[in-house]
Amino acid sequence: MSSILPTLGKDVSIDIGSIQTRLMGGTRGTVISEPSIIATDTKQEKVVAVGDEAARLVLRMPDMWRPLTPLKDGFIVDYRVMHTMLNYFLNKVSNALRRARVLVGVPCGMTDVEQRAMMDAVIQAGAREVFLIERPVAAAIGCGAPIFEARGSMVIDIGGGTVDMGIVSLGGIVDSKTIRFGGSDINNALLRYVRECFGVIVSDEIIEDIKHTVGTAMAPLEDAEYAFQGRDMMNGLG
C-alpha cells in the first residue's frame, strides 16, 4: 500500500456500500476495495479483523467470529462499527489523508444526523475536509453525463443494499428517491429459487456469477442456460 501513497495527492473519494467499501485517489483509481464488515470474537466481543480478513475469518470459522456491518439498506445502523471500519480503511492511506480533502458518496435522503456521523468519522480518521455527494450525482459524473447542462439526466445506481435514483441537471439533483432494495436482495431471491427448485445449496460466489451471467433488465428477456454445482440438500453430497 505504501507504493501508492505518493500518487493519491490531496483528494480521496470513498464509496461506503452495504456490501463493499471502495477508496479512490489520484490517477490510480480504486486503491482499496474490501467488504464492509468487521469480525468480532464471539466470547469477548473484541474486534479482530476488518474487511477482507474479516470476511475470510467468518467464512472459515463462523462459530468463533461474528460478522458486524455498519450499514443496512445503505443507511448507518451501527456508528461504532462504522467508525472502526472507516478508521481501518483510512489509516491504510493515513499519510495521504493527513491533509486530504475527502469526498464521500452517500444515499439520497440521508438525515442530518447520519450525514454528521459520517463526516465526523472521516474527520477523526485524519481528513482535513469532508464533502458528501449523493450517489446519483457521483454516478452521473462517472459515466460522463452532462450534469451541468440545462437538461435532465436520469441516473439509477444499484448498490448492494439500496437503489438510488435521481434526475440530475445544472449540477444538482432535481428529484431523487432511494429504494431499500439492492443486489443482496436479488442474491437472496436467487438462493431461495435454487434451493426450492433444484434442492441444491450453492456458494455466494456461484449466486453472484448467476446474477451477472444470465440476469438482465433489458428487453427482450430470453431464456439462458447456466450449469452449476452445489450440495444436495437431502444427502449432503456435492
What does each model-identified segment do?
Residues 1-158, 166-238:
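Nucleotide/phosphate-binding catalytic cleft detector across ATP-hydrolyzing
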